[in-house]
């Protein structure tokens, strides 16, 4: 339990058939889950409503409040409906509209060519196109297994010329807002306009959601500096990145995306196959442990699991392992991951972090928008950041930021009142030195006080 309370890296878990159970969700919350994800590629509105109800009910039992993230499907191409097909590396197989592996999308046939590498189900299946005859392909698989309906299909090194958001995305976004879901993950982003469109739709629908931009295309990587400026979070979607780039490039792309996020003061999330073997096995591989550890030391704010908790056999154990690995990475390394100071307020925040370490003081950030604790977090202080806020939306938004412990107060009148409430809630003790920082005008960090808790 000490690890759960001390861990600074945040954990996001996907809810699916394996975890659509209130007791399991309660256990995951107790093990330290900071947010839950609903994948709208696989969930109907009826199923999503049930998931929201289960999470909110579990929160009351576990005495916890966490954000829910709606992960929009985005403009992607998926297989059609067909009976499962077992493929091997010895035989040729057909991809067509009416036999073999079914694909009904014009955009796929317009883009695919002989010699292309096709990637199905986020990298689980790889095939080489041997022949193309109109809307019928002959392919040879490089991997083996059973392929089922509705899996994603991509062409390595190529992007489908599809616009975002789709009609389904808009419908799902509006549903999410009505359901009180706080965050939205935007899939297959190519440029900042894709993010701005989703924000406009959310605002016109009367909702407040924080945005997570999923970077998983060639254009998304190339335009990351523009995208990150209009996003609340960025997500390194390694599955689909592996469909567009050679796999050996993924570690450096991950490092680059995390560094760009840090440089712009935006938190980052690393996802896909973190503990994939735990979908079946109760213990992760050594390579998976090293992968998660490395993501933390690179500077990721959050770790997100998908199939491991959505359909896996050991969802609660997955959270325990993530918690322990992240805690170990933080404990054994002096994580001096730092972004660049962009303006005078960033330099001010960096100075506050340095001062807190020089005088061994805890950090208290009083915030209305969440920007002050986020500014502090990017410089990775040794102390936890207590973020006092009045807004439940800001409280939940901050739960995905490294080292930030948001605290929801009924009202904020002055610094002393906040400090005394934090003491009453046992976040602070008498005699502790603290640095209280806040903004005198919205959106900036420009005021501090050094106090001793009375």
Language-model regions, residue ranges each:
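Non-catalytic helical/linker scaffolds that mediate oligomerization, partner binding
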Residues: 1-454
């Amino acid at each position: 339990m000490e690890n759960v309370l001390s861990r600074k890296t945040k954990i996001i878990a996907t809810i699916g058939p394996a975890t659509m159970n209130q007791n399991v969700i309660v256990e995951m919350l107790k093990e330290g889950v900071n947010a839950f994800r609903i994948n709208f590629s696989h969930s109907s509105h009826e199923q999503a409503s049930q998931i929201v109800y289960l999470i909110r009910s579990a929160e009351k039992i576990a005495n916890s409040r966490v954000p829910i993230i709606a992960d929009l499907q985005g403009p992607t191409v998926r297989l059609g409906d067909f009976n499962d097909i077992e493929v091997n590396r010895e035989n040729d197989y057909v991809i067509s509209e009416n036999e073999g592996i079914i694909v009904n999308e014009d955009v796929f046939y317009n883009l695919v060519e002989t010699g292309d590498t096709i990637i199905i189900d986020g990298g689980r299946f790889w095939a080489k196109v041997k022949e193309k005859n109109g809307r019928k392909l002959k392919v040879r698989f490089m991997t083996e297994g059973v392929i089922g309906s509705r899996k994603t299909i991509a062409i390595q090194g190529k992007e489908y010329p599809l616009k975002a958001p789709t009609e389904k995305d808009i419908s799902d976004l509006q549903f999410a807002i009505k359901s009180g879901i706080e965050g939205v993950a935007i899939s297959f982003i190519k440029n900042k306009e894709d993010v701005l469109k989703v924000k406009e739709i959310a605002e016109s629908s009367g909702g407040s959601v924080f945005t997570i931009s999923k970077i998983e295309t060639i254009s998304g990587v190339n335009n990351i500096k523009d995208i990150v400026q209009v996003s609340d979070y960025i997500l390194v979607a390694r599955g689909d990145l592996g469909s567009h780039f050679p796999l050996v490039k993924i570690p450096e792309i991950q490092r680059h995306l995390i560094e760009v996020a840090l440089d712009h003061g935006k938190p980052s999330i690393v996802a896909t196959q973190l503990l994939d073997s735990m979908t079946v096995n109760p213990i992760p591989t050594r390579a998976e442990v090293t992968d998660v550890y490395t993501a933390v030391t690179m500077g990721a704010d959050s770790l997100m699991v998908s199939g491991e908790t959505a359909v896996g056999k050991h969802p609660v154990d997955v959270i325990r392992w993530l918690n322990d690995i992240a805690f170990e990475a933080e404990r054994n390394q002096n994580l001096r991951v730092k972004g660049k100071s962009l303006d005078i307020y960033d330099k001010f925040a960096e100075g506050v972090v340095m001062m807190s370490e020089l005088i061994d003081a805890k950090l208290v950030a009083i915030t209305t928008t969440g920007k002050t604790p986020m500014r502090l977090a990017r410089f990775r202080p040794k102390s936890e950041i207590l973020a006092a806020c009045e807004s439940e939306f800001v409280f939940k938004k901050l739960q995905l930021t490294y080292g930030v412990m948001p605290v929801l107060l009924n009202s904020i009148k002055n610094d002393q009142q906040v400090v005394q409430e934090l003491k009453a809630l046992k976040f602070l003790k008498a005699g502790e030195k603290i640095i209280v920082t806040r903004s005198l005008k919205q959106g900036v960090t420009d005021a501090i006080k050094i106090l001793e808790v009375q």
